[in-house]
Regions:
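Short catalytic-loop micro-motif centered on adjacent basic/acidic residues
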Residues: 76-77, 222-224
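Conserved glycine-rich "GG(E/T)P / GGGxP" loop and the immediately following alpha-helix
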Residues: 47-52, 182-211, 215, 227-234, ...
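Conserved, mostly hydrophobic/aromatic
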Residues: 150, 170, 187, 223, ...
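Proteins enriched for Cys/Gly/acidic motifs involved in redox and nucleic-acid/cofactor modification
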Residues: 1-195, 234, 245, 249, ...
Length: 424
């Protein structure tokens, strides 16, 4: 039997899809090259934006069309959309949708449902917990779900309440990855700063980082995503002493206006966020700062939008992931009066993206002439690419092997990547 996995959304979904791929292969299934060759499609869905949900529905509808013509493939739908829009999935996919697995279920529960669905009678019981190991870097989720309940966000409904993995389980997985040759570990959580709170750990997040940082074979350590309200000075001070932590901080600000931040239920102010960035830069002189921003939140005035423009100019983010507000389910923000017209949202998005691209280009071009360290992720015909400690993409010239750690001198740059040449 042939399968194809289609993944939408975040790194957490990428991680889960990798686990599920390993499971399918372990029970004798073969990965199809394309959807048309598959007997079934496993969709791992994302509900953060309306566009992501619509993308899933379009794909499920396409599978249904093929199913009506050829009797295959069928769909299995998992992830966040499966939690909040099961009726819509069944309406679009009809009899081609054979199984829906909610995003609130953990990997063990998904394993049991898949076993039952495929009537697998015997296989190695531990196989579903194995991580695909042939990678320069690996994502390792440490906490699932979210308890922050921002007014615009559907993740708590789609993913459930926060649930931390035991630290021993995380360290065991990371050790296996490092022993297999992985060089960079990226710890994941919807709000990773909350790691361990449900386990009764007062400083669980920084203690986890400290434990991972000590592991043999680790070259780089990263984490995402942090909630600014849960980042404290003590954590930053302890981070400064970590040998392998990379100087890249993703801190979603969402808005530069205090009234909008309050409506979003973000639990911090513009002033607090600016102080936090200042404290990060004090301790990590070469840190890159990236962020998420929503424009066109309900009732946002032109002046309030301009507050966000001003914040972006003041902080000079290395990158901003900018989205126009999208109504999600029955979240409080979706039900608010004062919804902004689409044309206004698009214009604000266009303006802010233009500003950010100019800032990113300027910051990247300031790297010209400098030498930086890159771990090679891909190499072919005298060219390779990898990422800097600040998580910037570098495309460079030189004959190297995948997973080599090399020095590269930057000679050009734009808003998308740096260009360099091998120096050794």
């Amino acid at each position: 039997m042939k399968f194809k996995i289609v993944t939408h959304g975040c790194q957490m979904n990428e991680y889960e899809s990798g686990k599920i791929r390993d499971f399918f292969i372990s029970i004798g299934f073969e990965e199809a090259i394309g959807i048309e060759d598959a007997d079934f499609i496993y969709f791992n869905s994302c509900a953060v934006r309306e566009k992501s949900e619509d993308k899933l529905m379009s794909a499920v509808g396409l599978v249904r069309s093929n199913f009506k013509k050829r009797g295959r493939p069928v769909s299995i739908v998992s992830g966040c959309v499966a939690t909040i829009s099961e009726k819509r999935i069944r309406r679009v996919g009809q009899d081609s949708v054979k199984l829906i697995i909610k995003g609130t279920e953990d990997l063990t529960e998904k394993e049991e449902k898949l076993k039952e669905f495929f009537k697998v009678l015997s296989f190695d019981e531990g196989v579903f917990a194995k991580q695909s190991l042939a990678s320069v870097y690996a994502y390792v989720p440490v906490i699932f779900g979210c308890d922050s309940f921002c007014s615009y966000c559907i993740v708590p409904a789609a993913r459930g309440r926060e649930k931390s993995r035991p630290i021993s389980e995380i360290l065991s997985e990371v050790k296996s990855l490092l022993e297999a040759g992985t060089k960079e570990i990226i710890l994941l959580g919807q709000n990773i700063n909350h790691y361990g709170k449900d386990l009764g750990l007062e400083n669980g997040f920084i203690e986890l980082l400290e434990n991972v940082d000590k592991l043999k074979g680790l070259e780089r350590l990263r984490f995402m995503t942090s909630h600014p309200a849960d980042f404290n000075i003590n954590t930053l001070d302890r981070m400064k002493n970590l040998e392998h932590l990379m100087p890249h901080f993703h801190l979603p600000v969402q808005s530069g206006n205090n009234r909008i931040l309050e409506l979003m239920k973000r639990d911090y102010t513009r002033e607090y966020y600016l102080r936090l960035i200042e404290e990060v830069k004090k301790r990590f002189k070469e840190a890159s700062i990236t962020t998420d921003i929503i424009v066109g939140f309900p009732t946002e005035t032109d002046e309030e939008y301009l507050s966000t423009e001003e914040l972006v100019q003041e902080i000079q983010f290395d990158r901003s992931f900018i989205a126009a507000f999208s109504k999600r389910g029955s979240t409080p923000a979706a039900l608010m009066d004062g919804q902004i017209e689409e044309t206004v949202k698009k214009e604000r998005h266009r303006r802010l993206l233009t500003i950010q691209n100019e800032i990113t280009r300027k910051i990247n071009r300031s790297s010209i002439g400098r030498t930086t360290e890159v771990i090679v992720e891909n190499s072919k015909e005298g060219k390779f690419f990898g990422r800097t400690p600040q998580d910037k993409l570098v495309i460079a010239e030189g004959s190297v092997n995948v997973s080599d750690t090399v020095k590269v001198q930057i000679y050009d740059a734009d808003e998308n990547h740096l260009k360099g040449k091998l120096t050794e």
